[in-house]
């Protein structure tokens, strides 16, 4: 099944930045965010909404790796941590939402200095809507490859294929989704920019309200998407949502970057 406003078609183009990070060019479009009532093991915070993404954006082909993190930040936050395999191609973990945001800011500065990024562009975390739109890649099924969870092992690392390997694996080893994105299902949870709310936001370019306007009880929670190497298939579904304090760091938390034009003043007030 395909989403309204987009088709699976050919895999989108990609670009490579100055640190060797490949980004997939995601087209603008419309889609239904969340899961249908009949989806197996869906939960109430996935109630469907109609979303329009009015602008194209770039999204990391893989999760940010340890090697990429070290190039930009010069640190190893995962060093000495539990359940981590040190490898430049493994995802950077033990990073909070704040850490990931700082990485995006520093990468923006590096790219501008290298002449690879225009003054009106930036790197940032994807919004929750952008993340799910890119994960689905034109599909409406539980996963980007269909509804059969038995196929999940071909596309991601989850609790069913990491029992003897208790760590996140090298990025890009599993099959990509229809738009060429790897590890959207499993491996590590991925931070999104949004504050967490119990209901999804629809409309055009939705972003959960910023600090000071979010109603309790979630004033510090940010959205996590994608599942990780130690969860059941239900946690790796395209619509699955999770949340945690923005300062939390753990062995199963990572992120991928988005690249887009800077938000306008009107957009920042959303």
Regions found by a protein language model. Name each.
Residues 30-41, 51-154, 193-204, 259-270:
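Active-site microenvironments of metalloenzymes and redox enzymes
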Residues 7-12:
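Boundary at the C-terminal end of the N-terminal hydrophobic targeting segment
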Residues 152-181, 214-215:
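A short, contiguous structural element within a folded domain that forms the immediate neighborhood
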Residues 1-4:
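Bacterial N-terminal signal peptides
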Residues 14, 25, 50, 82, ...:
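Conserved beta-strand positions that form and line the central face of beta-propeller blades
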Residues 16-33:
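Mature N-terminal segment immediately following signal peptide/propeptide cleavage
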Residues 41-52, 139-145, 162-167, 184-270:
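Surface-exposed recognition segments
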Residues 22, 121-122, 176-179:
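Short loop/turn microsegments at loop-to-beta-strand junctions
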């Amino acid at each position: 099944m395909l989403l309204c406003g987009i088709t699976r078609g050919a895999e989108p183009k990609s670009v490579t930045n100055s640190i060797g990070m490949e980004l997939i060019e995601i087209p603008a479009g419309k889609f239904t965010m969340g899961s249908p009532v009949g989806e197996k093991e869906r939960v109430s915070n996935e109630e469907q909404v109609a979303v329009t993404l009015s602008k194209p954006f770039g999204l990391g082909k893989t999760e940010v790796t340890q090697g990429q993190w070290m190039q930009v930040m010069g640190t190893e936050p995962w060093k000495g941590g539990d359940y981590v395999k040190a490898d430049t191609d493994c995802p950077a973990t033990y990073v909070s939402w704040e850490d990931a945001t700082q990485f995006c800011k520093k990468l923006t500065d590096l790219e501008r200095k290298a002449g690879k990024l225009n003054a009106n562009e930036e790197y940032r975390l994807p919004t929750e809507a952008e993340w799910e739109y890119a994960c689905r890649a034109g599909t409406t099924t539980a996963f980007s490859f269909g509804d059969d969870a038995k196929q999940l092992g071909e596309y991601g690392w989850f609790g069913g294929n990491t029992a003897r390997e208790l760590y996140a694996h090298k990025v890009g080893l599993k099959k990509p989704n229809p738009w060429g994105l790897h590890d959207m299902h499993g491996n590590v949870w991925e931070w999104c920019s949004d504050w967490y709310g119990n209901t999804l936001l629809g409309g055009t370019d939705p972003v959960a309200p910023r600090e000071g306007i979010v109603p309790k009880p979630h004033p510090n929670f940010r959205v996590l998407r994608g599942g990780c190497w130690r969860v059941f298939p239900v946690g790796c579904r395209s619509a699955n949502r999770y949340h945690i304090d923005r300062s939390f760091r753990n062995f199963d938390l990572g992120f991928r970057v988005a690249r887009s034009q800077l938000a306008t003043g009107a957009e920042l007030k959303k």
